[in-house]
Amino acid sequence: MNGRIFRDFSAKTIGGVVAEIREKMQSLTKYTYEIILVNDCSPDDTFDVIRKLALEDPKITAIDFVRNFGQHSALMAGLRQSAGDIVICLDDDGQTPADEADKLLEALENGADVAYARYAHKKHSLFRNFGSYVNEKMAEVMLDKPKTLYVSSYFATKRYIVDDMIRYENSYPYVIGLVLRATKNIVNVDINHRNREVGESGYTLKKLLGLWMNGFTSFSVKPLRIATIFGVISALAGFIYGIVIIIQHFVLPDRVMGFASLAAILVFFGGMIMIMLGLIGEYVGRIYISMNRSPQYIIKQIVKKEDVSEQNSDKQT
């Protein structure tokens, strides 16, 4: 059985993380492994560092994107490059302990298709924790995620799940949605959460909103159904209010109908209509982009020691 681990990194933390992965995987003697490092166009010299690591170790593959495509596109690139029976995905901030990967592997050996790390005490910022909470709740509503299941960026999955995930070619990948679509045999494993080694989380409110929109419009039609329900409720409310106005006109003929209430109603229903049109437009726009085959990511280069060795050998001959 092969254990495969990949992640994207910061140049300041990569050396220690790779060393930790090596040490842990070498202690698990029944596994062979490879490390796939995906550079999602980091602003520092990350790719120079991981390129050097790849040239020194045949077990390491370095992937460099042309531009920033986002975490989920980077994960898809790593999944497609992997070849093992098991794939373990880690985040890039040093907070996910690679030395506890054996806990995830054990869960898969016990029959699970996917094992997600669950943190008893998360050491993210208050904003990141709030974003994670909202993401959990929205996934429960939109993607039918079980309430007892905690999803995180640190997880292990079996090969047949990976094979199903990488068949997804639409422009907006959402890994959680792909996992939930593929299997319900998912478990949580308690893992310690570390303090962030360098910098701050790259997730801003804009990125979180974009991630939620990607996931829920790509893997669920529930937003459209919710919009339909709101439309029906609004129409009924408007109809009832119209009846009330007619009754008041006959019961209280001297009463002057207020312009303010009419304006408020128009603004409310106008806002509802614009929201629904925007939601429909989002779906139509994504269909259009997918039909144009907009790529999930563009790889600038892939570096492997064996490939470089073969090229040098060809030049010598």
Predicted feature locations:
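A conserved acidic beta->alpha catalytic loop
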Residues: N39-D48, G94-Q95
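Acceptor/aglycone-binding surface of glycosyltransferases and processive sugar-polymer synthases
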Residues: K52, I63-R67, Q71-Q81, Q95-P173, ...
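Cell-envelope/extracellular polymer assembly enzymes that use nucleotide-activated donors
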Residues: M1-N2, E34
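Short beta-strand/loop segment that forms part of the nucleotide-sugar
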Residues: V18, T29-C41, I63-D64
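Acidic helix N-cap motif at the loop->helix transition within catalytic regions
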Residues: K12-G15, D44-L53
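Short, well-formed alpha-helical segments that are part of the catalytic scaffolds
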Residues: F9-Q26
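Short aromatic/hydrophobic "clamp" motif used to bind/position activated sugar donors
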Residues: V87
